Amino acid sequence: MSTLDELIQKARHLRSEGHSPGQIADELSLSMETVTWLLTQEKGAATPKDVHIDWTAVSGESQLLVESAQMLLSRLHLKNPEGPVPQVYVGIAISGIPLATLMAVTEGVRIGIYHPAKHAGGDEPIGSMSGNFDIHAGERIVVVDDVITSGKTLQEVINYIKRHGAVPVACCVLFDKRGIRDIDGVPVYSLFKVSRID
């Protein structure tokens, strides 16, 4: 998928399948603003400035996904060799979950799952941890996702972790569209930084 028309078609298809705009944004690795535009744009309207990342060649292949999780772990350990040892890897739904699971298995620690507000319904959506894959006060947490588009979701997760008495020690992502080094003092480690040159 590379053309704008294909992105519009894919966004509309996902919407017709019942996906929320937040879920579509995650599926296409685009900002919420871009997805809103894809779903509602008018002829002649200016196209938002965003970068589409299609990593389905990796995400759909289990061995490549394992290797990606290993690279994230290597990046974390190389950048923070003396850092606190994580007790839980929290995957952000949806694409952060398999990466966090594989990282947690390798490290022999627990997995947590966070459902961001953009996936929730209602008038005032809020994010939350899965009841079956929760965190506990005092635990050291690494947050894992596939793409940083705006940084809002990572900020939301870090705020949640701190409010519940746990300690976020790092964030690991495959792709960073914003060049974010840290969020509220929590270091962000990415494998790839993606920039748009206008």
From Swiss-Prot:
This protein's record includes keyword Hydrolase: no
Highest rank taxon of the organism: Archaea
Gene3D superfamilies xref list: 3.40.50.2020
Any one GO biological process: UMP biosynthetic process
GO molecular function term, any single one: DNA binding
Entry keywords, A to Z: DNA-binding, Transcription, Transcription regulation
Protein family: Belongs to the purine/pyrimidine phosphoribosyltransferase family. GfcR subfamily.
HAMAP family: GfcR
Record text about domains: Contains an N-terminal DNA-binding winged helix-turn-helix domain and a C-terminal regulatory domain (or effector binding domain) resembling phosphoribosyltransferase (PRT) domain.
Name of this chain's protein: Transcriptional regulator GfcR
Source organism (scientific name): Methanospirillum hungatei JF-1 (strain ATCC 27890 / DSM 864 / NBRC 100397 / JF-1)
